[in-house]
């Protein structure tokens, strides 16, 4: 694989995974350059997702450690009957929110008719969802208060935020990060807390995607594989660095301003997708 392909894939994954700007839309913009198939796709996707996941785990290492300790606390809760600590509540909220994205993936792969599946992945549908859900983020951010923080997360809120991921899985262009941050802002959570919880509940999903890719490598014939292990390591490293930087940038911006810059970016991205669509490009040509 060329260096350009590796860099584009890594940066696209690392930057777009955690920002509320839709990775599906970006994939469409550069699909001709980064097009992958077979074992190449499995290896590179697993590597890029793993790198991005490690970036989030490192950035939120204190929260992750608290959630892991809280998970063990949950296992003993029926016996001890003690009130849960902050880490225990966080682990429980993540546990409640996570299954929806996995369920959505099963629904998308097995129960969506092929004609609808094709329509949802068209450039027009992705462009429309990029714009529409950008507007929804704008609305939620404008109406949502700033009164609720980390300690205010309830199981009901975790359920609602987690359930919003179903939309992102089924409708490409929605953005999993974007829709969960939208839901959290609509529920009144501070912008930084909305982003933090969105990323924490994304960790199990990225882990599952990476594992799926690795399992696929073990069962897919090796013939014709162009990507090497070195390519995978390069992608993972670049995705890690760009992912860590994008998380830091997002959190810094949200401490000072609203989600409006990301909303405007989504509008521009949706318009760019429409402008590069076959019909529009043909008409302009």
From Swiss-Prot:
From the Swiss-Prot or TrEMBL record, give the protein name.
Undecaprenyl-diphosphatase
Q: Which reaction does it catalyse?
A: di-trans,octa-cis-undecaprenyl diphosphate + H2O = di-trans,octa-cis-undecaprenyl phosphate + phosphate + H(+)
Q: Where are the transmembrane segments?
A: 40-60, 92-112, 122-142, 159-179, 197-217, 233-253, 259-279
Q: Name one GO cellular component term.
A: plasma membrane
Has the keyword Cell wall biogenesis/degradation been applied to this entry?
yes
- Designated gene of the protein: uppP
Family the entry assigns: Belongs to the UppP family.
Protein role = Catalyzes the dephosphorylation of undecaprenyl diphosphate (UPP). Confers resistance to bacitracin.
> What subcellular locations does the record give?
Cell inner membrane
Q: What class of enzyme is it?
A: hydrolase
Q: What else is known?
A: Bacitracin is thought to be involved in the inhibition of peptidoglycan synthesis by sequestering undecaprenyl diphosphate, thereby reducing the pool of lipid carrier available.
Write out the entry's keywords from A to Z. Antibiotic resistance, Cell inner membrane, Cell membrane, Cell shape, Cell wall biogenesis/degradation, Hydrolase, Membrane, Peptidoglycan synthesis, Transmembrane, Transmembrane helix
Name the membrane topology term.
Answer: Multi-pass membrane protein
């Amino acid at each position: 694989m060329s260096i350009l392909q590796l860099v584009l894939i890594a940066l696209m994954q690392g930057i777009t995974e955690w920002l509320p700007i839709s990775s599906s839309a970006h994939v469409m913009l550069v699909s001709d350059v980064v097009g992958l198939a077979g074992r190449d796709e499995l290896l590179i996707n697993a590597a890029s997702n793993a790198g991005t996941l490690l970036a989030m785990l490192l950035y939120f290492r204190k929260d992750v450690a608290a959630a892991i300790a809280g998970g063990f606390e949950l296992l003993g809760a029926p016996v001890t009957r003690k009130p849960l600590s902050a880490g225990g509540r966080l682990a429980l909220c993540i546990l409640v929110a996570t299954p929806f994205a996995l369920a959505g993936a099963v629904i998308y792969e097995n129960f969506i008719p092929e004609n609808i599946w094709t329509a949802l992945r068209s450039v027009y549908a992705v462009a429309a969802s990029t714009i529409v859900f950008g507007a929804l983020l704008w609305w939620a951010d404008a109406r949502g208060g700033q009164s609720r923080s980390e300690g205010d997360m309830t199981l009901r809120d975790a359920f609602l935020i987690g359930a919003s991921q179903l939309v992102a899985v089924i409708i490409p262009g929605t953005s999993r990060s974007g829709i969960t941050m939208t839901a959290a802002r609509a529920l009144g959570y501070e912008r930084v807390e909305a982003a933090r919880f969105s990323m924490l509940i994304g960790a199990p999903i990225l882990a599952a995607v990476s594992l799926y890719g690795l399992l696929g490598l073990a069962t897919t014939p090796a013939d014709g594989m162009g990507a090497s292990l070195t390519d995978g390591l390069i992608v993972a490293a670049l995705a890690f660095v760009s992912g860590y930087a994008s998380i830091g940038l997002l959190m810094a911006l949200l401490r000072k301003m609203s989600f409006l810059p990301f909303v405007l970016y989504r509008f521009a991205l949706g318009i760019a997708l429409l402008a590069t669509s076959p019909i529009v490009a043909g008409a302009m040509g």
